[in-house]
Amino acid sequence: MKEHKARKRFGQNFLQDTRIISDIVNAVRPQADDVVIEIGPGLAAITEPLAKKLNRLHVVEIDRDIVCRLKTLPFADKLVIHEGDVLQFDFNGIAGKKKIVGNLPYNISTPLLFKLAEVADDVVDMHFMLQKEVVDRMVAAPKSNDYGRLGVMLQYFFDMELLIDVPPESFDPAPKVDSAVVRMIPVKHRIGKADDFEHFAKLVKLAFHQRRKTIRNNLKELAGDDDLQAVDINPQDRAEHIAPEKYVALSNYLAGKAV
């Protein structure tokens, strides 16, 4: 089989560090009957050890050459191959509670994470390799430099933990950035539930639009000082000082006023 060259347009960096591969598979804890979806199987570094433990493994791959390669592997009979763009993939089309895993293309990681949040209710857990900078933003706490819109939105849906730091030399070709593996488990009991999720998402986006400005300035088209103080938010605070549940409370308060 001829060697596959990584394609930049697909954001391909192939994991080759056997220790990291083993750590990821151990973190996923696959059981034979689990419904597992792997995003971007690439050269099957994670695919093979997962397939050994599973009766069936769904894989989503956009690269036709890799799809052809997957079909020739000794364990191909265990694979259900979905060829296409994962951003267009219907995760709900696969029945059952799912475990989702993957070495995500860094160039589409943020829109993909937001897409996956939409199917959180049908997910057991997710384990992803991502740019470390992105993982730091995902798990960041309020009042930290990395805390922002991405963290607020994903923390609404998931409990998240950085599991493994991964250096560039663990890949071929080596990326120019450090990577990390994150575990994402859907939140079972939210501190607060947004009554109008679209309103909540718009509010959070506006709140972080200009980080140096106060929450009063960033949200002036949606909320006045009285609204902010009604849910115990200081109008002089900046967006990164405000916990996710406060954004939910503010959104619900404003939505209630509009009724």
Curated annotation (Swiss-Prot):
Q: What class of enzyme is it?
A: transferase
Provide the reaction this enzyme catalyses: adenosine(1518)/adenosine(1519) in 16S rRNA + 4 S-adenosyl-L-methionine = N(6)-dimethyladenosine(1518)/N(6)-dimethyladenosine(1519) in 16S rRNA + 4 S-adenosyl-L-homocysteine + 4 H(+)
State the GO CC annotations: cytosol
Q: Does the keyword Transferase apply?
A: yes
List locations, semicolon-separated.
Answer: Cytoplasm
Grouped into one coarse class, the protein's main location is: cytoplasm
Matching entries from InterPro entries are given as:
KsgA/Erm (IPR001737), rRNA_Ade_diMease-like_C (IPR023165), rRNA_Ade_Mease_Trfase_CS (IPR020596), rRNA_Ade_methylase_Trfase_N (IPR020598), rRNA_adenine_dimethylase (IPR011530), SAM-dependent_MTases_sf (IPR029063)
EC number(s) on file = 2.1.1.182
The UniProt keyword set, sorted, is:
Cytoplasm, Methyltransferase, RNA-binding, rRNA processing, S-adenosyl-L-methionine, Transferase
Q: Name one GO molecular function term.
A: RNA binding
- Residues annotated as binding S-adenosyl-L-methionine are N13, L15, G40, E61, D85, N103
Task: Please verify whether the record's keywords include GTP-binding.
Answer: no
What the entry lists under SUPFAM superfamilies is as follows:
S-adenosyl-L-methionine-dependent methyltransferases
The record's comment on protein family reads: Belongs to the class I-like SAM-binding methyltransferase superfamily. rRNA adenine N(6)-methyltransferase family. RsmA subfamily.
State the function annotated in the UniProt record. Specifically dimethylates two adjacent adenosines (A1518 and A1519) in the loop of a conserved hairpin near the 3'-end of 16S rRNA in the 30S particle. May play a critical role in biogenesis of 30S subunits.
Query: This protein is called what?
Result: Ribosomal RNA small subunit methyltransferase A
Source organism of this protein record? Neisseria meningitidis serogroup C (strain 053442)
Q: Which gene encodes it?
A: rsmA
